[in-house]
Design a protein with these regions (language model features):
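Intrinsically disordered, low-complexity polar/charged tails and linkers
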Residues: 51-140
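Signal peptide processing junction and immediate N-terminal pro/mature segment
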Residues: 37-54
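Eukaryote-specific recognition of extended, low-complexity intrinsically disordered regions enriched
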Residues: 2-4, 48-50, 92
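Long beta-strand-rich cores associated with HINT superfamily self-processing modules
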Residues: 142-277
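N-terminal secretory signal peptides that target proteins for export/translocation
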Residues: 1-20
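Long, polar low-complexity intrinsically disordered regions
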Residues: 2, 13, 25, 42-45, ...
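Bacterial N-terminal signal peptides
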Residues: 26-38
Length: 277
């Protein structure tokens, strides 16, 4: 029974044929070469047509295979995103359950010359949290569960401290939180580095919820807010090399304007200063 190629091809769009790409072109070229070398010079018109039909059928099969692989990959990406969304929702739910007590403890840190800033943004958004879980899992070659468990800023706070009392106030605030049942699990003093200027502490609340607390001056906080856009470009894997280079340059320019309080770069916690960058 003669192979009806026109009927076969009618079920496939030109788009599928094109997406077969290099493999399809290579296969077609190979078939044509074999015909030129092996077939008689006076090959019949019917035989030549049959060989051409067979090569086109192979192209169609390759197009189907390519579509199947792409659909499978897209399905896996969608499944991972859904898993990350669930983990993000669980982290936020737990944080919201403990938030009242944590916020109350942070508000106790407010004294003359120090105050909480950006309290309305204390929760990380669900989309941002889900994206961070995916990015950290890929970067560290770890499971989504492991990446989610390491996130420390589902709840985050910023204490702005007067420049004159900054070096003394930071350790006092941490001691005050420890007395309230918090544990300091990580301390990073970034004063004197090229980029971010300030002190970050990762805490574990009495309820077992990870919390981030940043210590800033009014000026360092303002510059952090202004430079946030270039910070996002620097860590965006989709940004071009030129875009990241320009964002890095602008970050250095911004942070060179920050005035460091006396003794801020010497502040430690249990003998550790963290690492400036």
């Amino acid at each position: 029974m003669k192979y009806d190629m026109k009927q076969k091809l009618s079920r496939y769009s030109a788009r599928k044929l094109l997406r077969a790409g290099w493999a399809a072109r290579t296969l077609t070229a190979t078939v044509m070469l074999m015909m030129a070398v092996v077939a008689p010079v006076n090959v019949s018109r019917g035989y030549a047509a049959a060989a051409s039909d067979e090569s086109l059928a192979a192209v169609v099969e390759l197009a189907d295979f390519s579509d199947g692989r792409e659909a499978k990959a897209a399905g896996k990406r969608r499944e991972r995103r859904e898993q990350a969304d669930v983990l993000a929702a669980q982290l936020l739910l737990r944080a919201r359950e403990a938030e009242d007590g944590i916020t109350a403890a942070m508000q106790q840190l407010e004294t003359e010359g120090s105050y909480l800033e950006g309290l309305e943004n204390r929760f990380k958004s669900a989309d941002s949290l889900s994206g961070k879980i995916l990015a950290d899992a890929d970067a560290n070659l770890e499971s989504l569960d492991t990446a989610a468990g390491a996130i420390s800023d589902v709840l985050r706070y910023t204490l702005v401290v007067d420049e004159k009392s900054y070096a003394d106030r930071v350790p006092k605030a941490l001691h005050q939180l420890e007395a309230s049942g918090f544990t300091v699990i990580k301390f990073r003093n970034a004063w004197g580095g090229k980029f971010y200027q300030g002190i970050n502490a990762q805490l574990m609340s009495p309820e077992g919820v990870r919390v981030e607390l940043q210590f800033h001056t009014a000026q360092s906080y303002a510059i952090k807010q202004v430079s946030h856009e270039v910070y996002e470009i620097r860590r965006n894997p989709k940004a071009s090399e030129d875009e990241r280079a320009e964002a890095t340059r602008m970050s250095v320019v911004y942070n060179n304007h920050v005035i460091m309080p006396d003794g801020a770069d010497k502040v430690t916690w249990e003998g550790k200063t963290g690492q400036a960058a």
